[in-house]
Amino acid sequence: MKTMTKYLGCLLMLLAVAIVSEPVQAASGAMSCVAKEKNRVTENAIDSVLVNGHMRHYRMVLPKMVQPNTPLVVLLHGYGGGNLNDETCMDSVAQRCGFALCVPAGLYDPKGKRSWNVGYPFQEGWAVDDVDDLCLLTKYVQQKYGLSPTDAFLTGMSNGGEMCYLMAYRNQTMFKAIASVAGLTLQWMYKGLEPQRPVPFMEIHGTEDRVSEWTGDLPNAGGWGAYMPVPIAVNRLVALNRCTHEVVEEVPVLNPSNGHRVFLHRYLGGDAGCDVWLYQVVGGTHCWHTVDMNTGAVIWNFFSQYLQR
């Protein structure tokens, strides 16, 4: 099942955030934190709002002192997730770096699972436009909590990662950059949609992911619908953003004992600075990586390049 799996590594996240800065800096510059020490205390709130006739529930992680330029990250759960009482592995990064975090819950799909409508075969006929709903929810949250009206970013894992691709393909203007973890481009998106608006995009994916296969699943053996191999999906966005060249480097891992290797592919020179990054976790499985890398810190490092731009 494509769920946002909880790992023991989440319990060590505060430590991992602190020690990840050196490996991340080696690949892409130091992790950029916008908060002062006194602003790192956060507040949690669970709330809801009616959006397009749907009651949308969400959890907010807010800096103690919200500023008019406080950025927002929206985090989308995996298939069947959506328990707003659970702390995510992005919470500690928000606490450290001072951005606001919104964790919305998906609606119940035809199978009775909370999910995002990305066009899985079993979602056929489900009249929910999560692209529009999430953009409206984000705007509402920005206004309600006095956040930056321009610095909003989107990330998600698995089903939430697929929603990230769909958001990019639908030419949205709400999110300045998008990051997917173990997400996929379904074949219907790849062939049926014509993305036209460049957007900075990052994918983090394990090569041994047996749920969201690195090599794709065009025969639809897994039942999620036919989807493209990860390199082909990423290259579509590279072409969209008109990136001019690729830089590949191996990133030091947090725990070398498992034998995994992480390669960062950066596609640079994109229109208006819209670059595409791909973290290839060799040997990595279907997870929010906390052993090889601090995924939350890596995501924020990517997003922070596009603050107030």
Named regions from a protein language model:
Residues M1-C10:
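Bacterial N-terminal signal peptides that target proteins for export
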Residues G9-A18:
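Bacterial N-terminal signal peptides
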Residues V24-L72, N85, V93-R96, W126, ...:
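A domain-start/cap signature at the N-terminus of enzymes
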Residues V66-G112, F175, Q187-W188, V211-E213, ...:
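Short substrate-entry loop that stabilizes the transition state in hydrolases
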Residues A105-D129:
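Cap/lid segment of the alpha/beta-hydrolase catalytic domain
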Residues Q123-Y145, L166:
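Alpha/beta-hydrolase active-site loop
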Residues E203-H205:
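Short beta-strand/loop motif that positions the catalytic acidic residue
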Residues T207-V248:
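Accessory cap/linker subdomain of secreted extracellular hydrolases
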